[in-house]
A protein has these predicted regions:
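Selective recognition of specific alpha-helical transmembrane segments in multi-pass small-molecule
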Residues: 115-123, 203-218, 229-249, 282-285, ...
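N-terminal alpha-helical transmembrane segments of multi-pass membrane transport
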Residues: 1-88, 98-105, 116, 440-462
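Flexible loop linkers connecting adjacent transmembrane helices
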Residues: 49-74, 96, 102-105, 118-159, ...
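Alpha-helical membrane segments and immediately flanking helix-loop junctions
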Residues: 68-100, 126-129, 136-151, 164, ...
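Helix-loop-helix module between adjacent transmembrane segments
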Residues: 39-44, 82, 115-140, 149-186, ...
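Membrane-interface loop-to-helix entry segments
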Residues: 35, 39, 43-59, 165, ...
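Extracellular/periplasmic helix-exit of transmembrane alpha-helices
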Residues: 123-135, 241-257, 270-271, 301-304, ...
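Transmembrane helix-loop junctions in multi-pass membrane proteins
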Residues: 46-51, 90-94, 176-189, 211-224, ...
């Protein structure tokens, strides 16, 4: 019954809503694809192509130090958001996109990132502007639930104990992160079964036990991610870059395949043109999280002298995630012969490609890399979750711990569930989060744009 409900909501959000007949090409788009493309295009135009104009400012904002000691630094917030993107998004998300949508899905992931960077800027700037003191953990907390609450108070003209839209966003976020917890264990157990022939149940239980030791500690923080994430991402980037450089003669053919399938000029392995577009954008959202309201939960925790700088940091995170690391994963798979990867999906597909490039070491490398990424992902999503738990239940150690236990249970469940069911729950949660987040982004976006103009005016005076 529960699985049927999840699949029903999934079809409502991600199933075909609009079908366009363009000559010999049929393009079927879902509600979420239309929503994200529209929002991304709108905010990209309103910010006047921010990812291009202010790229140097993004790099400068990441390097700023936190001298006050409270809250996170700009770099730490980038690390937290990268922890949830790199691994689940860059490995599992890209694999899922190519498995179902073919090579053309990669192009639409790039489009999602370029448009999503501006969306991420707006939501993260607002999160920083409307952050609140975190009396339980110290520092700051915030995110869409908090600026949705502010918007509701303005419309009502009075103080509110809670906002319906804010509560719905918070609940959707908790559902989504439970789904991601399942994706973590499902992917790791599958990878370890392929690499070491370890039964999924054993891998899942060990992963859950190790995760419990980390996340159930009262003083567990994101400081461990400061070292883990940069090293993991760096090693993965270097390894995949080496594979790409050793296959340079094949690279033009890969680009031809990506663009021809993306634009409907060649039939994709995973289905028609609409399937290519939808899966690329859907997995692009799962990877870079732009517009979903996840990253603002980290952005709000930063100690920052200008909300715009935090918006720039998170916009950069979207570009790093999808344009750089996701592309590396995609090229590794697409540089392998189709005869090697044909008929495979999930981590089986990526491991087969890595085995082709690096032999048995490639299978082990991906399994170990994914396991390490999964720890950082799990810590990252629980960091996101705690501000939403706090909005729903206040400053309560009981409810914070209860959600951590629930997430650990989802790790166990995910290791035993079917691949598609696990993804559907995550897609339902992230879809609902995006809808509720957009309810605030459009009416409040003017404040982020005003802050951007003031930031640029200050730059001219210096």
């Amino acid at each position: 019954m529960l699985i049927q409900l999840i699949e029903g909501v999934y079809r409502l959000l991600w199933g075909d809503l609009l079908t366009l007949h363009l000559g010999n090409v049929t393009l079927s788009l879902s509600f979420m694809v239309i929503l994200l493309l529209t929002a991304g295009g709108f905010f990209t135009l309103r910010t006047r192509l921010l990812p291009v104009r202010l790229f140097r400012d993004m790099l400068a904002a990441v390097c700023e130090k936190n001298d006050k000691g409270s809250g996170l630094s700009s770099f730490q917030t980038l690390v937290v958001s990268t922890a949830t993107r790199v691994g689940m998004g860059n490995l599992v998300g890209v694999v899922a996109a190519v498995s179902v949508g073919g090579a053309g899905a990669v192009f639409w992931m790039w489009v999602t990132a370029l448009l999503g960077a501006s969306t991420s800027f707006v939501e993260s700037t607002l999160a920083q502007k409307y952050k609140q003191p975190d009396h339980l953990y110290g520092g700051w907390r915030g995110g869409p639930a908090y600026y949705l609450h502010t918007l509701a108070e303005r419309k009502r003209g009075r103080k509110l104990r809670c906002s319906v839209a804010a509560c719905l966003f918070a609940v959707s976020g908790l559902i989504c992160w439970c789904g991601i917890s399942q994706v973590v264990s499902n992917s790791v157990s599958e990878a370890f079964q392929n690499a070491f022939s370890i039964p999924p149940l054993v891998t899942t239980l060990v992963l859950t036990a190790l995760a419990a030791v980390i996340v159930l500690r009262k003083e567990a923080t994101v400081k461990s991610l400061d070292v883990i994430v940069p090293i993991m991402a760096g090693c993965y980037f270097v390894m995949t870059l080496w594979i790409i450089l050793t296959h340079l003669p094949q690279l033009p053919g890969v680009f031809v395949r990506i663009f021809s399938e993306a634009l409907g000029l060649r039939q994709a392995v995973g289905g028609g043109f609409g399937a290519v577009v939808m899966n690329g954008i859907k997995r692009g959202l799962f990877s870079n999280e732009a517009g979903s309201g996840s990253a603002p939960c980290a952005a709000a925790a930063a100690e920052c002298d200008d909300p715009v700088k935090m918006g720039l940091v998170q916009a950069l995170g979207v570009l790093i995630d999808t344009i750089v690391i996701c592309s590396c994963t995609a090229f590794v798979m697409l540089l392998a012969p189709e005869s090697v990867t044909s008929g495979l999906q999930g981590m089986n597909l990526l491991q087969a490609a890595m085995q082709y490039h690096l032999g048995s070491f490639g299978v082990v490398f991906i399994a170990v890399t994914l396991a390490l990424f999964s720890f950082s992902t799990f810590i990252g999503i629980l960091y996101y979750a705690r501000c939403n738990v706090a909005y729903l239940f206040g400053d309560s150690w009981f409810w914070q711990t209860a959600y951590k236990v629930l997430a650990l249970v989802m790790l166990v469940v995910g290791g035993m569930q079917a691949y598609t069911v696990v993804w559907d729950l995550g897609d339902v949660g992230i879809g609902l989060m995006t809808i509720f987040n957009m309810l605030a982004l459009y009416p409040l976006s003017g404040e982020a744009l005003t802050a951007l103009r003031e930031y640029e005016a200050k730059k001219k005076l210096k």
